[in-house]
Amino acid sequence: MVGFTEIGLAAAMGALATIAGAFEDAESDVGSQSNPNSQVQLAPQMMNFHRYFNKAISGEPVSYMLYGAIAGTVTWVMMTKFGLPFLAAAAVGVGVNALIHMVFATTAHLGRMASAAEFGHPIYLDVVLSHLGPIAGFGGIATFAIVSLAYIQWALLKHPFPLPLLAALWGVTVGAIGSSTGDVHYGAERLYQHYPFGGGVPVAAHGNITRKAETGIRNSMDSVYFCAKFGNPLTGLCFGLVVFFSTWAGLFGQWGAVIAMGLVTLGCLIVSNRVEKKARESYGTYEDVEMDEICDPV
């Protein structure tokens, strides 16, 4: 019989996964990482200079596998070799990883921006300094949640894999979900806001990203402010539901998990349909426009 302890662990893992997914996507938005990054990288070649932070050397799954492995390894060493409790050990592991994270972010951004010097693009040092804090902060929260997930599996559920390996695997998973779920709202929704609603991103517009903010010139902090309203929570919800319902298979059997996931999927489809219909009724259908009718993003 399933007890309250097992249900509590499943709920805790789902909550931690939700936090990890939301803040992982927020961190990638601050740093212009993963799919939309190609548009930020292409912009200087199209003579569209910008103030976005641009740090993607690898995709989110690979980078968060590294961050999870680093934080998980340091946490495991602090617990097994120095006898620290989990929270203290995790704080040390996340702190060490945050320092490495900022080093990688800095070198990646400076390297990419330096490569754009051929097109006359400058390096804005204030952009580097102002974005490193949120990158380390959001990444630290996501990494702490990842390590906590791994700890629950390793220490409480007695998973045969060691904690560092579990943290690395969770890092790959949350990075993949953040890349596939959250990037839409940073890419087509935010980088191309000066184009008509619902038109997508035509090939001819690649690199012609939005550079004006509500006030002044846009940077990546504006992007995460926008994505925190919908894209980040949606990513967290996606990862949280995946983890939560995957634990249901062990708690309530295969069919219990299938039925629960089916009901949630049906509910999401209904909500998505209602939201899209309301958006179309509010903003109208997409109409073709001439390029000279589109506002200048400079």
UniProtKB/Swiss-Prot annotation:
Location relative to the cell: Cell membrane
InterPro entries the UniProt entry points to: MeTrfase_E
Keywords, comma-separated and alphabetical: Cell membrane, Membrane, Methanogenesis, Methyltransferase, One-carbon metabolism, Transferase, Translocase, Transmembrane, Transmembrane helix
GO CC terms in record: cytoplasm; plasma membrane; vesicle membrane
UniProt keyword Metal-binding, yes or no: no
Transmembrane segments: 3-23, 59-79, 84-104, 132-152, 160-180, 230-250, 251-271
Catalytic reactions on record: 5-methyl-5,6,7,8-tetrahydromethanopterin + coenzyme M + 2 Na(+)(in) = 5,6,7,8-tetrahydromethanopterin + methyl-coenzyme M + 2 Na(+)(out)
Pfam families per record: MtrE
Gene Ontology molecular function terms on file: tetrahydromethanopterin S-methyltransferase activity
Major location category of this protein: membrane
GO biological process terms, semicolon-separated: methanogenesis, from carbon dioxide; methylation; one-carbon metabolic process
Enzyme Commission code(s) on record: 7.2.1.4
Pathway involvement of the protein, from the record: One-carbon metabolism; methanogenesis from CO(2); methyl-coenzyme M from 5,10-methylene-5,6,7,8-tetrahydromethanopterin: step 2/2
Enzyme type, top EC level: translocase
Keyword DNA-binding in record: no
Similarity field: Belongs to the MtrE family.
Complex formation: The complex is composed of 8 subunits; MtrA, MtrB, MtrC, MtrD, MtrE, MtrF, MtrG and MtrH.
Protein name: Tetrahydromethanopterin S-methyltransferase subunit E
